From Swiss-Prot:
Extra remark beyond the main annotation: The reaction mechanism probably proceeds via the activation of Pup by phosphorylation of its C-terminal glutamate, which is then subject to nucleophilic attack by the substrate lysine, resulting in an isopeptide bond and the release of phosphate as a good leaving group.
Keywords attached to this entry: ATP-binding, Ligase, Magnesium, Metal-binding, Nucleotide-binding, Ubl conjugation pathway
Pfam families: Pup_ligase (PF03136)
Family to which the UniProt record says this protein belongs: Belongs to the Pup ligase/Pup deamidase family. Pup-conjugating enzyme subfamily.
GO terms of biological process kind: modification-dependent protein catabolic process; proteasomal protein catabolic process; protein pupylation
Effect on the protein of changing residue 199 to A: Reduces pupylation
Annotated Mg(2+) binding sites: 16, 62, 70
Effect of residue 130 to A: Abolishes pupylation
Enzyme class, broadest EC rank: ligase
Protein's name in the database: Pup--protein ligase
Keyword Membrane: no
Length: 482
């Protein structure tokens, strides 16, 4: 029987971000995105003989299928920590882009690399921002998905990234006209719960890779979310999901709100900023997306009143109160139609305000190329060039964390999880010039004699075997230089 204590208030989590990529040149050689991506990763390949590596902050950096650089955060166990490491990925990716520009300039190829933290390119291809949450093995994933699905489908209302939807004239099945959508990802999922990730993207992926004790835990892989730019949007996306997971684990009385058609509903919600479209539930009743979110929010507010404070690390009740405050303000804004209380915190609201302003000033239609440019450049991660960056630097977008904390996360792994141990190994290996083989759980030194450590507990930041492995590398440092 579930109790309040059954909820994981300290939970391992992470975010994987795929970046869109293009190269804008002058009158020199035109380079394809895949060529630019390889140029970005060239120094990594030259050093490590691979484009798929773990880096000293404990995170994973790799070149995904096609031309999408991807960054997966190290294991984090509290909300602000996760935001710091997610944003650190933007810094790391942009530094790689700058290095690529400088390398190309030496070959008389002038131009700028653009990395976009969005989810849809100009021809309708989608790439992801995936969330990972460690959950107990005791609850079957399909049962968990059934309880979680109504929240995830309607969550776009409170934290979507927003975009202008342009109908594809080549798609004969296209049924939606030109319009503003609150989510970028909603049109690109096709199932509720499935093991697929690309061919038939689900809302929740069931691939069983816990990267922990598989008898105790599983990894909930959510692939429906948008890539967010504003820190408060990330906080609300992840923080609200943490609260819902905790309520499900504690059997806190969250009602069943199963939708009759998940995929039709997610697309309809994306095109209704009022959240007022009636959705059919499996029990024969109807509710709006806003009403579903309000029900979940009311339960989350009551949950926080008795939520156990995490004992070691984890997301504190104080921080969860910040999440609830923003969640409540956002729901009130949707209900009233007055978004002035959240128009510096929620991406789709910020972007829609910008687009509406351009429309009014220039008497533009929604299909005007200038608006498509605004839509895209909001997601440019280059400081001082991207529209989001400019707005944030002017104080027009609120912060959840600080630049100092983000920059610290660029070089140093989280100190409360297994990532701390991985970071120590990688920093020692880098300093000593030791070739190591690393993944989420296994860490191996290949010579002079193979030595390996398996870190099965993602919650543990202390391990004597890691101390011994680093000592082994130090003792044999000379042999690596010969």
């Amino acid at each position: 029987m579930s109790t309040v204590e059954s909820a994981l208030t300290r939970r391992i989590m992470g975010i994987e971000t795929e970046y869109g990529l293009t190269f804008v040149d002058g009158d020199s050689k035109k380079l394809r995105p895949d060529e630019i991506a390889r140029r970005m990763f060239r120094p990594i390949v030259e050093k490590y003989s691979s484009s798929n590596i773990f880096i000293p902050n404990g995170s994973r950096l790799y070149l995904d299928v096609g031309s999408h650089p991807e960054y997966a955060t190290a294991e984090c166990d509290n909300l602000t920590q996760l935001i710091n490491f997610e944003k650190a990925g933007d810094v790391i990716a942009d530094r790689m882009a700058v290095d690529a520009e400088e390398s190309l300039a030496k070959e008389d190829i002038a131009g700028q690399v653009y990395l976009f933290k969005n989810n849809v390119d100009s021809v309708g291809n989608s790439y992801g921002c995936h969330e990972n949450y460690l959950v107990g093995r005791s609850m079957p994933l399909k049962a968990l998905g059934k309880r979680l699905m109504p929240f995830l489908i309607t969550r776009q209302l409170i934290c979507g990234a927003g975009r202008i939807h342009h109908p594809n004239p080549l798609d004969k099945g296209e049924s939606f006209p030109l319009g503003y959508c609150i989510s970028q990802r909603s049109d690109h999922v096709w199932e509720g719960v499935s093991s697929a990730t690309t061919r038939s993207r689900p809302i929740i992926n069931t691939r069983d890779e816990p990267h922990a004790d598989s008898h105790s835990y599983r990894r909930l892989h959510v692939i429906v979310g948008d890539a967010n730019m504003a820190e408060p949007s990330i906080a609300l996306k992840v923080g609200s999901t943490l609260l819902v997971l905790e309520m499900i684990e504690a059997d806190f009385g969250l009602p069943s709100l199963e939708l009759a058609n998940d995929i039709a509903s997610i697309r309809e919600i994306s095109r209704d900023a009022t959240g007022s479209t009636l959705l059919s539930l499996k029990d024969g009743t109807t509710m709006t997306a806003l009403q579903i979110q309000q029900v979940v929010f009311e339960h989350a507010s009551k949950w926080l009143e008795q939520r156990p404070e995490p004992e070691f690390s984890g997301t504190s009740n104080t921080e969860m109160a910040r999440v609830l405050d923003l969640w409540g303000r956002m729901l009130k804004a949707i209900e009233s139609g007055d978004f002035s209380e959240v128009d510096t915190e929620i991406d789709w609201v910020i972007k829609k305000k910008l687009i509406d302003r351009f429309i009014q000033r220039g008497n533009l239609g929604l299909d005007d190329p200038k608006l498509a440019q605004v839509d895209l450049t909001y997601h440019d991660i280059r400081p001082g060039r991207g529209l989001f960056s400019v707005l944030q630097s002017r104080g027009m977008i609120k912060r959840w964390t600080t630049d100092e904390a983000i920059l610290a996360a660029v070089d140093t792994a989280p100190d409360t999880t297994r990532a701390h141990l991985r970071g120590r190994i990688l920093k020692a290996a880098d300093t000593l010039g030791v070739p190591v083989t690393v993944d989420w759980m296994r860490h191996k030194v290949n010579r002079p004699e193979p030595q390996s450590v398996e870190l099965g507990d993602p919650f543990s930041a202390v391990n004597s075997e890691v101390d011994q492995l680093i000592e082994y590398m130090t003792v044999h440092a000379e042999s690596y230089r010969s």
